[in-house]
Amino acid sequence: MLRCHTVEHVARVRSIAEPTWLDADTPVSETSFEAALLAAGAAIAAAESGGFALARPPGHHALADRAMGFCLFDNVAVAARHAQAELGLARIAILDWDVHHGNGTEAIFWDDPTVLFVSLHQWPFYPGSGGPGTGNETTVNVPLDALSGDDDYRRVFTGVVEPVIHAFAPELLLVSAGFDAHEADPLADMRVTDDGFRWMAQRASTLAPRVAAVLEGGYNVATLPRLVQAALEGFAK
């Protein structure tokens, strides 16, 4: 955890003794620290095994020194640092297709040439970062207009995501797999279908020798299990 987060932030989350709010979007209770540790541990297990971590709370908004946007610790960032330190994998790529920009993951790896971060997200939208022209040599933001659907995602996937990741040549690809860009999600305005997520997962599965995924957003409880299954089918092909 301390490879990604400050001692003060970890201690702050650990000290929570009653229900409260860390920001306007992040409620916590006395059990949140344990849940967040288990989520980060699940991400590590996924990175080690090539699995899919069904983790809650999500992680990609968490900054090094504070929680944000439902996220306490950055699960995928913790998994990436673990893979480098414990698995000996030098080059890691992170693909974030959650509908929100993964600002926390971006910030943690901003100055690190060994980790590539690629984010597809609705823009303008929460958290307000990741707009046109942002990024650096190892941070690639692909902002998409509201109402973007399968064809739009396929266009930027084949035109931007795949060439960038292939050029970086990662030893491990971690997918921040949010499903809130789905057409039935209540918190966003995108039009990706079940087949769209299945297609992205299948394409992602070819981009590195090792691939793993970690659940991020997705707020329609009726459709989320089906979408995770669609992604698993894609990753397995």
Spans of model-derived segments:
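HDAC/HDAC-like amidohydrolase catalytic core signature
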Residues: M1-K237
